[in-house]
Amino acid sequence: MAVIKRALISVSDKTGIVEFARELAGYGVEILSTGGTAALLRQEGLAVKDVSEYTGFPEMLDGRVKTLHPKVHGGLLGMRENPAHVAKMKEHGIEPIDMVVVNLYPFEATVAKPDCTLEDAIENIDIGGPTMLRSAAKNNRDVTVVVDHVDYDQVLAEMKGSGGAVSRGTNFKLAVKVYQHTAAYDGAISNWLGQRMGDELADFSDTLTVQFKKVQDMRYGENPHQKAAFYVERDVQEASISTSRQLQGKELSYNNIADTDAALECVKQFNEGPACVIVKHANPCGVALGSNLLEAYNRAFSTDSESAFGGIIAFNRELDGTTAQAIVERQFVEVIIAPAVSAEAIDVVATKKNVRLLECGYWPQEPGARYDFKRVNGGLLVQDADLLLSGDIKPVTKRVPTEEEMRDLLFTWRVAKFVKSNAIVYGKDGMTIGVGAGQMSRVNSARIAGIKAELAGLEVPGSVMASDAFFPFRDGLDNAAKAGIKAVIQPGGSIRDEEVIAAADEHGIAMVFTGMRHFRH
């Protein structure tokens, strides 16, 4: 453990840097700096030596060359306990640099701007910063390297307790963080530039680098014999399971997280009023709109109260005390998630200490584009997330849906998007009547939806039906007619569409095509 005597500070994100540098100066640390960081520290009354003065070589090429100099990197890489290194440093007038505080040009923030040009992106690729970070991290036995302002307090606390020194254990952890950071930084550059190698912007780069941060080790995975952990993206913006805050309850399990994600992403589809989604094994078993949250929950629960036992409940409005009371009195629930939770609701759910209560924040009505990943043995499938609802919805039958039927068709269509294929959803008056999920036969999914409705004591006649993919034969419409379905929404696109349309016309069923399939595997 060596005392910090000299620090090089050069940061783009200046959060907390003045206070940190002032503390370093209090330990007698000499501060080297560049450009805007040096100007800020001087403005705040701190003594700073420019790196150009230290190296005897000016900044040049519009600031592209500032710290790329042997006096900087020799001072970082020279091993203090290696006599040959020490002798060579003395021979060339190289002084040790004991600490590097550097964060990088904001490449990702720059390329996220709609008007970003290739030239803008190139100028925000940091060269000197990563080079210093990697040099310091390599020699972490002797050099403390700080890439994240959240680590300032930890470093200062250690210096306070050890006379201005930082332990090798802490240096090693900080060095690992540097390599993780620079790997992600280079990955972002590689991904962005890789899409621009041809004459046109490519949807996918030839290589893909992704980095996630571990936030939780889990007791086990999908099954008790599997180990598991939860990782999140480095910069999650939209409200999601990954941004949620747990207010109470047991630790989230692997299955809890997967199911809560399914429930929350489904309920995000409904902006027109209070909505509730109940999920079991990643499938919606009850979805409903209501005049208030309690009504939405009651209606969703009534769809399939048996499957709702031990389920996940998601809302699109602040969870209130009355709705929370209805839940805890009525059913066993694993997780409740909402954009906000009232103080009264927190008190109510606290009576069931094991229930996991999550608050995720509100989301925009128009979700941002993102990728979906699916791991296969030896590879990774990457696709655009299925964020679009439909193409051009058009009636294809003699009878056109009524306004009320059209509302229910669009409601069930949004639900079907989140049901495992083959998916059939029956709905009426803004609630699901029956859900048929995950069957190899579309007709069997329809049968299951009918069975679910019957078990729940709900009437299918007069309902509408949504199918996540086209009907390959007319039997789907024949069975729908027998069940009393009055209107159908489906993508269309079968070679037997005319036969299916004819069947709908024979039964007086109104049918619309969306032109967009929503398989979910």
UniProtKB/Swiss-Prot annotation:
Domain (MGS-like): residue spans on this chain: 1-147
Pathway where it operates: Purine metabolism; IMP biosynthesis via de novo pathway; 5-formamido-1-(5-phospho-D-ribosyl)imidazole-4-carboxamide from 5-amino-1-(5-phospho-D-ribosyl)imidazole-4-carboxamide (10-formyl THF route): step 1/1; Purine metabolism; IMP biosynthesis via de novo pathway; IMP from 5-formamido-1-(5-phospho-D-ribosyl)imidazole-4-carboxamide: step 1/1
Show the CDD domains listed in the entry. IMPCH
Q: Which GO terms describe its cellular component?
A: cytosol
Per UniProt, which keywords does this protein have? Answer: Hydrolase, Multifunctional enzyme, Purine biosynthesis, Transferase
Q: What is its EC number?
A: 2.1.2.3, 3.5.4.10
Catalyzed chemical reaction(s): (6R)-10-formyltetrahydrofolate + 5-amino-1-(5-phospho-beta-D-ribosyl)imidazole-4-carboxamide = 5-formamido-1-(5-phospho-D-ribosyl)imidazole-4-carboxamide + (6S)-5,6,7,8-tetrahydrofolate; IMP + H2O = 5-formamido-1-(5-phospho-D-ribosyl)imidazole-4-carboxamide
State the superkingdom: Bacteria
Presence of the UniProt keyword Hydrolase in the record:
yes
One MF term in the entry's GO annotations: phosphoribosylaminoimidazolecarboxamide formyltransferase activity
Biological processes annotated in GO: 'de novo' IMP biosynthetic process
Keyword RNA-binding, does the record have it? no
Family statement: Belongs to the PurH family.
Q: What's said on domains?
A: The IMP cyclohydrolase activity resides in the N-terminal region.
Q: By what name is this protein known?
A: Bifunctional purine biosynthesis protein PurH
